[in-house]
């Protein structure tokens, strides 16, 4: 009987409803999401390139920011392309294995980003509270180890939840009232009692949220105490410029995750869940590079330096109707 249930599950087919309730908005939404995703890709890959080519940004803080841009690019690229396709085609079906693969990679990168924000908070804490020991405390070896650990933890959490999803059983054809394969949506469709799977999802999400927020809040509590002891206003401004971008990104990302996964589903309508999911799967990956570029002096200086090089500056080239020559 177990084999029969496993075969039924593996052969199950799902239809992603997405935004089919709003047929008149399908095309406008397609172009809006395409633009947002396009700018997100350019912003995150651009941030990676800027950090790579500018030696001044080869510090632990920008090493972690580099990985944040990579993670944002990855998890938005797992969701956005399929969402865009489903906005313009009638066949929105996906197999159970396809659903599971999408969820696994998406969950891996989302959990990785949660831990990464906590690591970045600790990095800010050491830089501000122990500046003389910063290069010793946050060494290249430690940075590499932390990155390996946070990716490994993301994979471990995803693997645990994916294995729990393998135990779910479905009847043939199913409809997911979402635009991607979210585990809570799959659990709600399974026909035996799926309480344990729901409990596991809630436990993993809550544990990651509480542990990372505890690290973040503790780090910033020490940062605030240290800042209040600084006699000069310039020191306060420097701390603010260092932490403002990170705090803004944390507030947006963690607020959305808490709303979606650490509140009982019954308290949120499916429409509200979809809107919040769009925000953290498509919009947040666009906002992060903007936040870190517009509110970060070092990044703005790096961008300005690139623009002002002889290859980009208008004063260093003469334009002709069919060609241009760059002055040496």
Curated annotation (Swiss-Prot):
Gene Ontology process terms (BP): G protein-coupled receptor signaling pathway; sensory perception of smell
Give me the Cytoplasmic side stretches, as residue ranges. Answer: 49-56, 123-141, 220-239, 295-328
How does this protein lie in the membrane?
Multi-pass membrane protein
| Superkingdom of origin | Eukaryota
Listed GO cellular component terms? Answer: plasma membrane
Q: Which residues lie on this side of the membrane: Extracellular?
A: 1-27, 78-101, 163-198, 261-273
Family membership = Belongs to the G-protein coupled receptor 1 family.
Q: What does this protein do?
A: Odorant receptor.
* Protein name in the entry: Olfactory receptor 5D16
Which source organism? Homo sapiens
- What taxonomic ancestry is recorded? Eukaryota, Metazoa, Chordata, Craniata, Vertebrata
This chain is encoded by the gene named: OR5D16
